[in-house]
Amino acid sequence: YTGVRDYMNNIKAQAKEDKFVETIMGRRLYLNEINAANGLRRQAAERAAINAPLQGSAADIIKKAMLDIDQLLLNEMQDVKMIMQVHDELVFECPKSKADAVMEKMKDTMEKTVELNIPLIAEAAIGSNWNEAH
């Protein structure tokens, strides 16, 4: 994919100039080895330059969603509990009678947690346990 190659080249060039990369919410990863003479160290820093904005931004988004949902739970849904986070997934516990409404509210909240140039789509499922929800 040309766009992916362009992204990789542009982010490496920017990192070589700035000596850091940023996530969507401005967290920085400093890359002290990005211009290293040692090829292995330089290549490791280049890989980090490419991966950190993507993986770090995903982490930013899920953490922001957790904060938004925490406020929602405190203010509107005290009988719903956020149980755990697994990578980009959140697991909740709620009364069975409210499961559909809770699922839709969580999905909507997660999709609106950050404004991007493209839609942010969240998937949701209901189950009696984590395995059933997959």
Label each residue range with its predicted role.
Residues Y1-H134:
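Conserved catalytic core of nucleotide polymerization and phosphodiester-bond processing enzymes
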